[in-house]
Amino acid sequence: LLHEAITQSLAGRIALTTLLPFSFEELRTSNHSSKATAHDYLPMQYEHILWSGTYPRVIAHGVPANEWLPNYIATYIERDVRQIQAITDLAQFTLFVRMCAGRTGQIINLSAMANECGISPNTAKAWISLLEASYIIFKVPPYHQNFNKRLIKAPKLYFYDTGLACSLLGIQSPEQVQSHFARGALFETMIATDIKKWFIHRGKQANISFWRDSNG
């Protein structure tokens, strides 16, 4: 709502900039990460960056991820969500967000998500759009030579920050990432997100897609 009010009142007189959690490129070229860089994390210590994520508060200010991220989630749900959309059952919405974290890197199945959360498919669709509008998640469409089929086929869901996804999944340490069922999906999320950041930081549209053959 605030975004809409600003763009309507200052149309033609503003420039919008998307600020996302740090990319690997930023970690390498800045002094924000005094303890470690992306080169230090990958490939041997990538579980650590999967778990901590790259929000500035965690990376630049050294606030422990397991302290800051749960507070960020609570603030987002209790304050920001109320301002953006009139959601009456915040507990149910919280469950839905956690469910999305368990599906990062997977194809979106609105019917299944709605059934598991006890909501309608239309509500699930609206909540996905809300998470997307507030830069919690983004969607990646499947690649197909026929453009119309790209619009029809279901996209994949990715979190902008793997640390946020880990916090929602209840992962308490980098060591737990190593044996967690979502480890592969979190790694895929980290790569997909960094590709998207590469485009956004250069003022380009991130027209990325995923490939899936007949064998899945």
Predicted segments — roles?
Residues 3-107:
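Interdomain motor-coupling "hinge/lid" segment immediately C-terminal to the ATP-binding subdomain
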Residues 59-216:
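Accessory nucleic acid-recognition modules appended to NTPase machines
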Residues 2-3, 168:
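Short catalytic/ligand-binding loop motif for oxyanion handling, primarily in non-cytosolic enzymes
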